[in-house]
Amino acid sequence: MKPKQSGNQPPKTGLVKEYFRNGQLCSVGKYRDGKKTGIWKYYLRNGKLKATGKYSKDELAGPWKWFRENGNLLQTGTFKNGKQEGLWKRYHPNGELYDEGRYLDGKKAGLWKYYDAKGKLSRMKNY
């Protein structure tokens, strides 16, 4: 979400909390000179954590985690310069690993492993 800025207002700086229309917290994080920076947290309408990770000069940077509505982990991964980089993992709704592999400059690279809902390796693919 980009904050609305108009006219000659100075860029946002400091801690910012954004809310859904129902008043529930939507996100919390810091701005520096109008750009997202540091750790941000995003929430679902039910109040549970949806995602958390770091920004650097308005770009995704470093490790991120996403969660399902029930609180279970959905996926984890790392960003560099706003692009997916390094090891990424996604999980089935039951918490078992769904797939894992690496990204290089925002694209799948090398061997990726895919698992069934019981956690058993079902296939592998090279990218």
Kindly label every feature range from the protein language model:
Residues M1-Y127:
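Glycine/tyrosine- and acidic-biased, solvent-exposed loop/turn segments at the edges of beta-strands
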